[in-house]
Amino acid sequence: MSNTPIELKGSSFTLSVVHLHEAEPKVIHQALEDKIAQAPAFLKHAPVVLNVSALEDPVNWSAMHKAVSATGLRVIGVSGCKDAQLKAEIEKMGLPILTEGKEKAPRPAPTPQAPAQNTTPVTKTRLIDTPVRSGQRIYAPQCDLIVTSHVSAGAELIADGNIHVYGMMRGRALAGASGDRETQIFCTNLMAELVSIAGEYWLSDQIPAEFYGKAARLQLVENALTVQPLN
């Protein structure tokens, strides 16, 4: 048992960021209601961060916060805020102003070295060979995730590496959770509520119709999510 009443530890969480492109609260409210209706198991009562960097017109922050909260989403912070007056209004409501992480500059390529003798590279993989049911969340840290059975709506797969689903995929699949943009998602039957690679995501209605219910492979190409047949 710890000798101190609290302990501070670093951690990370998967959060949705809502980028606001309209300053009218009623418009935002309706747009969010429409999105939530498309994937209620994923978005209903979800914690979200509001990004206001694209707002050009003045915004009534109190009304905006109420409009978003009325959908059931839980606003836990705001990012992309550069306006001093808006910052003051946000902080007055007790919401933190968050600073999004910047991409690191690429490091110089290391000098090639001769491989060590008698070493075999090991690729970690987490294997799930039972159905993943609604409400379950499977996380594969620092490795790939393979599911050999069905994934129900309302279930969530998260991996720092690739995700493979050899069954009907009805839930949510988030590959590259730690930011690896080279990861991919492979499904033999793509019917997902949401697919995401390194934060770039599609809801079910954004998956091209010709790939819905089909074997598919998803990856990022020029920072955009793409899908192609899984051969």
Curated annotation (Swiss-Prot):
InterPro entries linked to this entry: CAP/MinC_C (IPR016098), MinC (IPR013033), MinC_C_sf (IPR036145), MinC_N (IPR007874), Septum_form_inhib_MinC_C (IPR005526)
GO biological process terms, semicolon-separated: cell morphogenesis; division septum site selection; regulation of cell division; regulation of cell septum assembly
Keyword Methyltransferase: no
MF annotations from Gene Ontology: enzyme inhibitor activity; identical protein binding
Disordered: annotated span: 101-125
Cellular component annotations (GO), alphabetically ordered: cell pole; cytosol
Function: Cell division inhibitor that blocks the formation of polar Z ring septums. Rapidly oscillates between the poles of the cell to destabilize FtsZ filaments that have formed before they mature into polar Z rings. Prevents FtsZ polymerization.
PANTHER family according to UniProt: SEPTUM SITE-DETERMINING PROTEIN MINC
Quaternary state and interactors: Interacts with MinD and FtsZ; homodimer.
Protein name as catalogued: Septum site-determining protein MinC
This protein's encoding gene: minC
